[in-house]
Amino acid sequence: MVKLLMSWDIKSGAESEYFEFIVREYAPGIMKLGVQPTEAWYTVFGEGSQILTGAVAEDLATMQAILNSSDWQSLQSKLFEYVTNFQYKIVRATGRFQML
């Protein structure tokens, strides 16, 4: 099993629209593609990324196929309307907390 670690900051003034998009489109969309969310962290204080999130897929080939799909690209394009400083990394899932 592999894990997709992602982080980003929400654009100032876009918080309501961002959370609406995440709940109604992004989370259901990535699950439909075969990526299972495992956690999401919202940073209130400090200098780190505002959002840290993780999701798993069965194996690296599956994850890469998902990330290369047009459906994933469409979801990412919509996400980028609400966020900045997007970063991601694919790692082997350990079952423990993992950071980008």
Summary of predicted features, one role per range:
Residues 91-100:
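Short, low-order "capping/linker" segments at domain edges
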Residues 14, 61-63, 96:
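Residue-level signal for secondary-structure boundary sites
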Residues 2-9:
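Active-site-flanking beta-strand signature of metal-NTP-handling nucleotidyl enzymes
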